[in-house]
């Protein structure tokens, strides 16, 4: 490796989410701000929602006789 061409690597970089969650990781930046993390993302919290565009979901459920969970 060539000397003095690589960025400084911080082993204690702080990641701050808009929800207030913080955690430590390694990065070339000392502090990282994010809008969504695993604490507030719907996939990880189990609060997923189906986005219905013009009744398509209801038509699909009606066509295949499916019930909403």
UniProtKB/Swiss-Prot annotation:
Function text: Binds the 23S rRNA.
InterPro entries (alphabetical): Ribosomal_bL28/bL31-like_sf, Ribosomal_bL31, Ribosomal_bL31_A, Ribosomal_bL31_sf
Family label: Belongs to the bacterial ribosomal protein bL31 family. Type A subfamily.
Name of encoding gene: rpmE
Subunit structure: Part of the 50S ribosomal subunit.
Source organism (scientific name): Thermoanaerobacter pseudethanolicus (strain ATCC 33223 / 39E)
Entry GO terms, CC: ribonucleoprotein complex; ribosome
Pfam family, one: Ribosomal_L31
Protein name: Large ribosomal subunit protein bL31
GO BP term, example: translation
PROSITE patterns given in the database record: RIBOSOMAL_L31
UniProt keyword annotations, A-Z: Metal-binding, Ribonucleoprotein, Ribosomal protein, RNA-binding, rRNA-binding, Zinc
